[in-house]
C-alpha cells in the first residue's frame, strides 16, 4: 500500500555528498526530519577510489565529529611537488609556510562513506531509507510530491525540498530535464594503488609528463595512490600490461623522485570529462555534487567542490521557514557560481596547458611553474585554493 509521509527535505543519494549534506542540515535544524533515499540495501555503495580531502573539507568533518575515527586511516599532505618532466619548471608548496599543519588528507572513499553512513544512522532526525530509488517529483505551491521505489513498492510522499545528490547519472536532474554542458578531454584516468620501497613522507606529487599528467598521493604503509591521465589508446595499452610491466611503465613516466615502485593493486580506468549543469535549481529541487558537476582529477578538487555545495546549502537553510522557496535556492545558486568558475577555470586550464607539447606553450607553462616557486603571494593564493579556502 502506498503511504504519504511529510519531510521538510528529501535527499536522493546517500553517498559522500548526500550523507554530508544531511548531517550538516540535521545538526543545525533539530526541528526538521530529513529522509535519505539510498538505492543500496546495506549502506552506501562500495567505493574503491582514494580521495584527496582539502584542509577545509577535513575541518568540516572535524566539526561534525566524524574525523576522529578516520584520522588513523588517513595520510596528511604536508608538501606538494609540481613539476614538468624533462623541463626546468618545478615548484614546492609546504603546509607550514601557509600556517597549517597539512594542506589536506588522503583517505579511502569507502572509509569516509562508512563513517558518514554511521553518523547518519546515529542522528535522530535523519531517516535513512535503504533500497530506495528516487523516481519523480511534481511541484506544487508549497510542497513537492515525490515518488520513489523501495523494493517492489511504489511510495508517494511530500516534501518542501528535494536535494539531488544522486551522482553523475542523477535521476533528480533527468526528471527535471536539466541539460549538462560537457567537455570531453579525450583522456582516460588510470588509477591504482602502488606499493613503494619508501614512504612518501607527506609529499604529494603532480608530475606533467609527455604521456600525460601523473599524480601520486601519500597513503599509509608505504603506499601511494596513482592517478595517470592518458589518451584512450594509451590507457588501454597500459591497462593491458602485466603488473610488472605496469610498474615499469609508471616508473619510466614518473622517474625516481619518489623512490622505487614495487607492486600495484586495484587498477581501473575511467573517461575524463568536465560536466556542468546549466542550472542547479528548479522548482523546489537542487542538485549538488556530481549530480551538478564532475571535474578532471588533475587538481583533486572534484569531491571538495561537492563538499562546499553541502556547506553552502546548509548555511543558507539554517534559518529558512520553507527550505524549498526560490528565495533560498536562488541564493544558493548565486553563491556557488564564483567557486564553480574559479575551480573549473583552474582545472580546465591545467588540463589544456599541460597536455600540449607545443614548444611555446611548454616554455610558457614552465615559466609559470618557476614563477609560482619564486613568488610567495602567488604560491600562497594557489595553496589556499587547493586547501579549499575562498580567500
Residue ranges and their predicted role:
Residues 2-15:
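Beta1/beta-strand and adjacent pyrophosphate-binding region of the FAD-binding site
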Residues 18-19:
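N-terminal Rossmann-fold NAD(P) dinucleotide-binding loop
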Residues 48-85:
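N-terminal FAD cofactor-binding segment of flavoenzymes
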Residues 315-391:
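C-terminal helical "tail/cap" subdomain of flavin- and related membrane-associated enzymes
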Residues 236-324:
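FAD/FMN-dependent oxidoreductases across multiple families
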Residues 5, 70-76, 81-175, 184-188, ...:
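Conserved N-terminal helical subregion
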Residues 24-49:
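Glycine-rich FAD pyrophosphate-binding loop
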Residues 61, 153-156, 161-267:
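Conserved FAD-binding catalytic core of PHBH/FMO-like flavoproteins
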Amino acid at each position: 500500500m502506498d503511504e504519504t509521509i511529510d519531510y521538510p527535505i528529501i535527499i536522493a543519494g546517500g553517498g559522500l555528498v548526500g550523507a554530508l549534506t544531511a548531517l550538516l542540515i540535521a545538526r543545525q535544524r533539530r526541528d526538521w526530519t530529513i529522509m535519505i533515499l539510498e538505492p543500496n540495501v546495506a549502506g552506501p555503495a562500495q567505493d574503491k577510489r582514494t580521495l584527496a580531502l582539502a584542509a577545509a573539507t577535513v575541518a568540516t568533518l572535524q566539526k561534525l565529529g566524524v574525523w576522529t575515527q578516520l584520522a588513523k586511516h588517513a595520510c596528511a599532505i604536508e608538501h606538494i611537488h609540481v613539476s614538468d618532466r624533462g623541463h626546468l619548471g618545478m615548484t614546492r608548496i609546504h603546509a607550514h609556510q601557509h600556517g597549517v599543519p597539512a594542506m589536506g588528507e588522503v583517505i579511502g572513499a569507502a572509509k569516509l562513506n562508512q563513517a558518514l553512513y554511521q553518523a547518519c544512522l546515529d542522528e535522530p532526525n535523519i531517516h535513512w531509507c535503504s533500497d530506495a530509488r528516487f523516481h519523480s517529483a511534481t511541484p506544487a505551491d508549497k510542497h513537492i510530491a515525490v515518488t520513489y521505489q523501495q523494493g517492489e513498492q511504489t511510495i508517494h510522499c511530500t516534501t518542501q525540498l528535494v536535494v539531488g545528490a544522486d551522482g553523475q547519472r542523477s535521476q533528480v536532474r533527468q526528471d527535471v530535464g536539466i541539460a549538462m554542458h560537457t567537455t570531453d578531454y579525450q583522456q582516460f584516468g588510470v588509477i591504482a594503488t602502488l606499493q613503494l620501497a619508501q614512504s612518501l613522507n607527506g609529499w604529494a606529487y603532480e608530475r606533467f609528463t609527455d604521456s600525460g599528467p601523473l599524480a601520486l598521493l601519500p597513503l599509509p604503509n608505504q603506499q601511494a595512490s596513482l592517478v595517470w591521465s592518458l589518451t584512450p589508446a594509451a590507457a588501454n595499452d597500459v591497462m593491458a600490461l602485466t603488473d610488472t610491466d605496469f610498474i615499469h611503465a609508471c616508473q619510466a613516466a614518473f622517474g625516481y623522485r619518489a623512490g622505487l615502485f614495487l607492486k600495484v593493486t586495484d587498477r581501473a580506468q575511467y573517461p575524463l570529462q568536465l560536466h556542468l549543469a546549466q542550472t542547479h535549481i528548479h522548482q523546489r529541487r537542487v542538485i549538488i555534487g556530481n549530480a551538478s558537476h564532475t571535474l578532471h582529477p588533475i587538481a583533486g578538487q572534484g569531491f571538495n567542490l561537492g563538499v562546499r555545495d553541502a556547506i553552502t546549502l546548509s548555511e543558507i537553510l539554517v534559518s529558512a521557514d520553507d527550505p524549498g522557496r526560490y528565495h533560498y535556492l536562488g541564493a544558493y545558486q548565486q553563491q556557488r557560481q564564483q567557486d564553480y568558475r574559479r575551480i573549473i577555470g583552474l582545472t580546465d586550464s591545467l588540463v589544456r596547458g599541460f597536455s600540449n607539447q607545443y614548444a611555446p606553450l611548454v616554455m610558457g607553462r614552465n615559466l609559470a611553474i618557476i614563477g609560482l616557486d619564486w613568488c610567495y603571494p602567488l604560491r600562497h593564493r594557489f595553496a589556499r585554493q587547493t586547501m579549499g579556502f575562498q580567500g
